Amino acid sequence: MTSRRSLPRLAAAVLGVSLTLSAVPAATADPRIPAAPTVSEQQVMPHLRALQRIADRNGGNRAHGTKGYAESVAYVKRALDRAGFRTRLVPFTHDGATGNNLIADWPGGDPDHVLMTGAHLDSVKEGPGINDNGSGSAAVLATALQVARTGLKPERHLRFAWWGAEEPGLIGSAEYVGKLSAADRRRIDVYLNFDQAGSRNTRQWLVIHDDEHGETEAQQAFEAWFAERSVPTFDIGVGGSDHESFGNAGIPSSGFSTGISDCIHEACDDLSNVDPKTERTSTEAIVGVLWKLAATTPRH
């Protein structure tokens, strides 16, 4: 979560009502959409432990331009390569240092209708960034690996991204979007962003509402997923994380956050700053909505 943001609505939402994280049966499934797999804590928390270890052996952080960030990218890329994704590193330079965005494409689906999902992988220099944003990165990685494990055959093309240099000001995602052709921008039906997916003080899931493009199908899908499980949500606008880069380019966006944690941008944003149940719920929500959107008829 970039330090540039001012999110009074987000902070206020964290003061909302309490919730119960136990699973609640979902509504009757659409027979056209394959059932989304369940996610266990054991399928997502090991990624956070790995990111913590990377920070521990690299001066306590995984910031842009550091060995800790490079090792974080290598860890995620290795897992995706083994799972059968087509991965590529997209380099950029900021503040005299080279960084990489990691892009992973799942074979198949309509290349003219891309469903893109992402999270920033860098931390600030002051800490390991395990909730901000190891939690979002781990949830997106676990989702991608579920796609591979189940052999999902989507109607839309699935693309995943892990962004660099979000903390200094959305640099990596802005560089990526800025270099897309007009045709490639039009091919992205929606971009889903996840920043802080495991906050311990979560009261509501904060669903991104793209005001410029109206209520997107993705926002509706997230709100429906949470409502079916009696999980409170709160709408927030586009801004403050990498979805802003896509919104500025006219690309619809959604996603969610679990709110600003008690420790952010400090050394205490370590593994103890993530609630495993919240992280699991977030990952299951991403999986559930991605499965639905991947199987639906593209809008344009």
Q: Which residues make up each language-model segment?
A:
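Secretory targeting and sorting signals
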Residues: 1-29
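N-terminal capping segment at the start of a domain
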Residues: 30-67, 122, 192, 196-199, ...
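Extracytoplasmic/secreted proteins, especially bacterial periplasmic and envelope-associated proteins
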Residues: 34, 43-46, 50, 67-87, ...
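A non-catalytic alpha/beta surface segment that caps or lines the substrate-entry region
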Residues: 49, 53-107
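Solvent-exposed loop/turn segments at secondary-structure junctions
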Residues: 57-58, 86, 93-97, 108-111, ...
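Alpha-helical metal-binding/catalytic segments enriched in His/Glu/Asp
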Residues: 117, 121-170, 286
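Metal-dependent peptidase/peptidase-like ectodomains
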Residues: 163-261
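His/Asp/Glu-rich mid-to-C-terminal helical/loop segments that flank catalytic regions of hydrolases
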Residues: 262-300
